[in-house]
C-alpha cells in the first residue's frame, strides 16, 4: 500500500519568514531594510513564503530527501529569502518569535516566523534582488512606518537580544576577522542602552584572559584614527570563537 501525506479540510494560512539583520556602524545599531517591489509597497524586512511541494515531494522531504524548490525547514526559508532579496548570507540565524494576527497583512492570513542575525560589513555586501527594488541600512530607532507588522518585529528582536546580552559570544558576529577589545566593547555596550551601563572593567577581566591565546599580529582591515597610548591588542575572530566555545 502506498504511503500518502494526510490531508485536512480546514483552512490553512500561508507561512513566511522575516529576518532582522543588524550591524553596528558609526556608533549606532542599524537594521537592513528592503524596498518592496510588489504590493503592498514600502520598506520592510527581507523575508518571504515557505516553499512547499506536493504530497509526494513533502513525504520524501519528511524522510530527509531534498528538493531544489522546497524549503527543508523554516531556517532554510529565512536564509534563502535573505540571500535572494538582499544578497546576505549570515553565519547564524536566531529564531525569536511568530506573528499571525488577522490584520497583519492586507492580502490574507499569513503567519511569519521571525529571526535575527548579526553581520559585519567585511562579510556582508547587500544588494537588492528578486522582490526588492532597493535596500538601505537604517538606525534601529528610526525603523518605523514599515510594511505589515515589521515595526513590532524589529522592536521585539531588539528586546530579545538585550535579554541575551550576557551571552557574550553572540556579539562576536558584529566583529571583523581581526578586531580589538575596544571595538568589541563599544559594539557590545550599545545593547545595554536604557539599562544600567555595562561594567566595562568586569567585561575586560572576563575576556582578557580568555582571548589571550587568540592574539594576532595581523593588521586591522580598517584601523581607524590612531589612539593615544600603546596600540590595542588585536584578536583573530575565529580563534576567539573557538576559545569561547561559540557554536558554528
Q: What is each residue range found by the language model?
A:
Residues 114-117, 125-165, 174-187, 202-210, ...:
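NUDIX/MutT-family hydrolases
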Residues 196-219:
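Charge-enriched amphipathic alpha-helical scaffolds
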Residues 31, 35-43, 47, 54-55, ...:
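Short, His- and charge-rich active-site/binding loops that engage polyanionic ligands
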Amino acid at each position: 500500500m502506498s504511503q500518502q501525506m494526510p490531508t485536512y479540510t480546514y483552512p490553512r494560512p500561508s507561512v513566511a519568514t522575516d529576518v532582522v539583520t543588524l550591524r553596528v556602524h558609526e556608533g549606532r545599531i542599524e537594521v537592513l531594510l528592503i524596498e518592496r517591489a510588489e504590493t503592498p509597497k514600502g520598506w520592510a524586512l527581507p523575508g518571504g513564503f515557505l516553499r512547499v511541494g506536493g504530497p509526494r515531494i513533502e513525504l520524501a522531504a519528511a524522510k530527509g530527501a531534498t528538493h531544489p524548490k522546497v524549503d527543508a525547514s523554516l531556517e532554510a526559508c529565512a536564509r534563502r529569502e535573505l540571500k535572494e532579496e538582499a544578497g546576505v548570507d549570515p553565519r547564524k540565524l536566531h529564531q525569536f518569535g511568530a506573528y499571525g494576527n488577522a490584520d497583519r497583512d492586507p492580502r490574507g492570513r499569513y503567519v511569519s516566523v521571525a529571526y535575527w542575525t548579526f553581520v559585519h560589513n567585511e562579510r556582508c555586501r547587500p544588494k537588492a534582488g528578486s522582490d526588492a527594488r532597493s535596500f538601505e541600512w537604517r538606525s534601529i530607532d528610526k525603523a518605523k512606518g514599515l510594511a505589515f507588522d515589521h515595526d513590532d518585529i524589529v522592536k521585539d528582536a531588539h528586546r530579545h537580544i538585550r535579554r541575551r546580552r550576557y551571552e557574550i559570544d553572540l556579539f562576536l558576529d558584529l566583529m571583523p576577522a581581526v578586531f580589538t577589545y575596544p571595538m568589541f566593547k563599544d559594539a557590545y555596550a550599545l545593547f545595554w542602552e536604557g539599562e544600567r551601563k555595562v561594567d566595562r572593567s568586569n567585561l575586560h577581566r572576563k575576556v582578557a584572559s580568555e582571548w589571550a591565546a587568540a592574539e594576532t599580529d595581523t593588521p586591522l582591515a580598517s584601523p581607524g584614527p590612531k589612539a593615544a597610548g600603546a596600540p590595542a591588542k588585536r584578536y583573530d575572530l575565529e580563534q576567539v570563537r573557538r576559545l569561547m566555545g561559540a557554536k558554528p
